[in-house]
From Swiss-Prot:
InterPro entries: DNA/RNA_pol_sf (IPR043502), Rev_trsase/Diguanyl_cyclase (IPR043128), RNA-dir_pol_PSvirus (IPR007094), RNA_pol_HCV (IPR002166). The keyword Nucleotide-binding applies. This is RNA-directed RNA polymerase. Its EC number is 2.7.7.48. Keywords: Host mitochondrion, Nucleotide-binding, Nucleotidyltransferase, RNA-directed RNA polymerase, Transferase, Viral RNA replication. The gene is ORF1.
Length: 791
């Protein structure tokens, strides 16, 4: 028996189960007959071999099925483009099937020959189109849907995430593509039903890109790079290289207290930058009423401070208060304007009797606001606080001893210290500030400061809704815009502003404006004399290296008490005359020279055709902006409405504001002062943008990096005064969750896709400000939001 087992094992004929069973047989009583023992061995061996064979067969079957599955999967992957193409082909075949119905609809639409009348003016007649010469529609060509899918994927950077905001954004983009190709509603619906699912699903390019990104060689390269960023400790180095002299020397140095080896690392020099102001390189034009007095003194360089690494690619700078800048500012912004050939010429004058056309508006306004009287100096002071009140208190005391004089209306001019967008215009004409003596402002303010509110409400009543957009929160402005939009069946918004409004305010315009004030104050002789001094302006411009004396007739002076009110009054009156004379119903949003008018889409052609010519009759150069058929694309005061999930909020254009808010015209006296300034900007910004994509994270980043700072002093400082601060004073928004509706609305407003919004927010949420000044002349730190590289 033992000999037989040895034979089976040595011969390799028995498996482990066979050996176990034969061993069990061998343990039987040896008194059994040999035939019985052999019979038992034969049975055990046969059953064991059968059992092992069945196991082998099962394993082979599993392996075979797995191999077959792999082959089928590979074949299926290779077949995926074919399936996608078949889906696209199916969609195009469906489009072709309804071709006849669509042609019939188009022919019915082309048979309309009725004249369209806007108000009292006809703007065109539909004419019949011969089907034989009708242009071939590109959407009927076979690769059209495939082209739409590729365009959309390129726009969204591949396959977008399946979020609600992305689905809406993709649908909107596909719809706009169909609209550009003049697809009819039937065709657009069919194309969207096919293209949108394809865009939201990965294709072979998406799969291949992800596979390449996670391939072994690229994964290994990334791991190698991460590993090389650090060095092993000296003990590990010695264990791995026991025969290396350098390893032993490194170990001995460490044991002796000498510095250890360190991996290469860039020096972090901080992100606070100090930029020097600049002087214009342009010198042209002269005027007989302007006399220069250069002085041999150095130019005082202004400073502009910047928080680097957080803004967009838009760059800003500041003009120095130099004689060259002052001269160009007066020549190009007071005495002359540019024509179409970029040549200087005097500002256009209004047509004779043009402002007589505004008599109806003036009388209607007077019937609403009624008559008023001047207020006392004390009541005037109650309108102000802080440093401005202190200045006016000194003027009031001065007037108690000496009444206002003609020389108090003379101008004291200087170059405005403001953030200049040098990316948009590298060397623009500097703006100048032309204030009069505060004694004169107090006397005019006693009449007009309180009256300003009544004037605005009167204009609102004439326009049948809020029109002068001053003193409102960003939510209130959004609601005003939405209410005006919803009051029309097929609304369109047309933006326009006047080129250098102050410069084009002629003497005739000032006289008409003054007549409105005099009507309200019963033609008060003292007020009439004060206002008359604004018709002929004498002034002296002061620079660090010289001065300029000049005289100009008319023009709006930036420091006058009635500058903002007068600009709004003139703009609203001229615009109202345009629509009233043409019988067109419209709503206006105005903030001085910045205007947006909302009307029916069928009226847009008349507005765009005649608006520029109408304003030219009053001596103004009107510039039309792109009309908006999507509510979120209305632009007013560099803001657009964004839906936060509950209501519309006006949001500043992040392509510019993210950079502009990182610059400071006021001085940073040290790192602690810079911290306070950054904190103040963050608090102001968050009060305007809480719950809004991207910008909420931007301002939260500023607050998070300055948590232990008290910025109340900065918020009151005169160097921090701006429209941004005044708007933020009215805001009370808080940081909160961002809804999918807000992301989609933000995409409609600014073109930033939801996925890109989340990516930028992740960058800002993880960003740490390095509090240190960068040496002057060093290149700017690369912004983390470099993707926003357009104006």
């Amino acid at each position: 028996m033992d000999t037989g087992l040895k034979f089976l094992v040595s011969g390799g004929l028995a498996t482990s189960s066979v050996i176990r069973k034969v061993s069990a047989v061998s343990s039987l009583d040896s008194s059994l007959p040999s035939s019985s023992i052999l019979s038992a061995i034969h049975g055990s061996w046969t059953s064991a071999i059968s059992h092992d064979c069945s196991k082998i067969a099962k394993v082979a079957a599993i392996v075979g099925i797995g191999y077959l599955g792999v082959r089928i999967g590979a074949a299926w992957c290779r077949r995926t483009p074919g399936i996608t193409n078949s889906i696209i082909t199916y969609g195009e075949e469906v489009v072709e099937q309804v071709k006849v119905d669509i042609d019939e609809d188009a022919e019915e639409e082309s048979d309309i020959g009725e004249e369209i009348v806007v108000g009292t003016i006809g703007i065109g007649i539909h004419t019949n189109v011969n089907p034989e010469v009708r242009a071939k529609r590109r959407h009927r060509s076979r690769p059209f849907i495939k082209k739409i899918v590729n365009l959309t994927k390129n726009h969204f950077g591949g396959c977008p995430d399946s979020s609600k905001s992305n689905v809406m954004a993709v649908s909107k983009f596909v719809y706009e593509q169909c609209k550009q190709h003049n697809c009819l509603p039937h065709q657009t619906r069919l194309i969207m039903s096919i293209a949108v699912p394809l865009v939201l699903s990965p294709d072979m390019y998406d799969i291949s890109s992800k596979a390449l990104l996670n391939s072994e060689i690229l994964t290994e390269n990334r791991a190698t790079l991460d590993r090389l960023k650090t060095l092993d400790g000296w003990l590990t180095h010695l264990v791995c290289h026991p025969l290396s002299a350098k390893a032993w020397r490194r170990a001995i140095d460490n044991l002796c207290g000498l510095p250890d080896w360190k991996a290469f690392k860039l020096v972090n020099x901080g992100c606070l930058e100090e930029l020097a102001g600049f002087c214009t390189s342009v010198r042209r034009g002269t005027h007989p009423d302007m006399t220069e007095f250069p002085q041999d003194r150095p130019i005082k360089t202004r400073k502009l401070y910047c928080l680097g690494g957080v803004g967009t690619s838009v760059k800003f700078n500041v003009h120095n208060n130099s004689l060259a800048n002052l001269r160009r500012g007066l020549v190009e912004r007071v005495f002359f304007v540019e024509n179409d050939k970029k040549e200087l010429e005097p500002a256009p004058k209004p047509l004779s009797g043009a402002f007589d056309r505004l008599t109806w508006f003036r009388r209607k306004l007077h019937s609403i606001v009624g008559t008023h009287s001047s207020i006392s100096p004390g009541q005037f002071l109650d309108f102000y606080t802080g440093r401005r009140r202190t200045i006016y208190e000194g003027a009031v005391k001065s007037l108690e001893g000496l009444s206002v004089q003609r020389r108090d209306a003379y101008l004291k001019t200087f170059v405005k210290a403001e953030k200049i967008n040098t990316t948009k215009k590298p060397d623009p004409a500097p703006r100048v500030i032309q204030p009069r003596n505060v004694r004169y402002n107090v006397e005019v303010g006693r009449y007009l400061r309180r009256f300003e509110h009544y004037l605005y409400r009167g204009i609102d009543e004439i326009w049948n809704g809020p029109t002068i957009i001053k003193g409102y929160t960003v939510e209130q402005i959004g609601k005003i815009a939405r209410d005006a939009w919803d009051s029309f069946v097929s609304p369109v918004a047309i933006g326009f502003d006047m080129k250098r409004f102050d410069q084009h305010v002629s003497s005739d315009a000032l006289k008409w404006e003054h007549s409105v004030y005099l009507d309200a104050f019963c033609h008060d002789s003292y007020l009439a004399e004060l206002l008359k001094w604004q018709l002929v302006n004498k002034g002296v411009g002061y620079a660090s290296d010289g001065m300029i004396k000049y005289k100009v007739d008319g023009c709006r002076m930036s420091g006058d008490m009635n500058t903002a009110m007068g600009n709004c009054l003139i703009a609203c009156a001229i615009t109202h005359d345009f629509f009233r004379s043409r019988g067109i119903r419209a709503r206006l949003m105005n903030n001085g020279d910045d205007c947006v008018v909302i009307c029916e889409k069928e009226c847009a052609a008349v507005v765009k055709a005649d608006m520029v010519r109408h304003w030219r009759q009053f001596g103004f150069q009107c510039e039309l902006e792109c009309d908006a058929e999507i509510f979120e694309q209305i632009e007013f005061c560099q803001m657009r409405p964004v839906y936060d999930g509950e209501k519309y909020v006006m949001v500043r254009n992040p392509l510019v504001s993210l950079s502009k808010d990182s610059y400071s015209v006021g001085p940073w006296n040290g790192i602690n002062h810079a911290r306070k300034w950054v904190n103040a900007v963050g608090l102001c910004g968050l009060s305007l943008t809480g719950g809004i994509p991207v910008v909420q994270s931007y301002y939260n980043m500023m607050i998070r990096n300055t948590q232990s700072v008290n910025s109340s002093g900065i918020l009151r400082d005169v160097s921090f005064a701006s429209g941004f601060r005044e708007l933020a004073r009215l805001g009370n928004r808080k940081s909160g969750a961002i809804s999918e509706d807000a992301r989609f609305s933000f995409y409609l407003a600014f073109g930033i896709t939801p996925d890109l919004q989340r990516a930028m927010e992740s960058d800002y949420d993880a960003h740490t400000i390095e509090w240190g000044f960068v040496p002057q002349g060093n290149p700017r730190i690369q912004p983390i939001s470099w993707t926003l590289n357009e104006l």
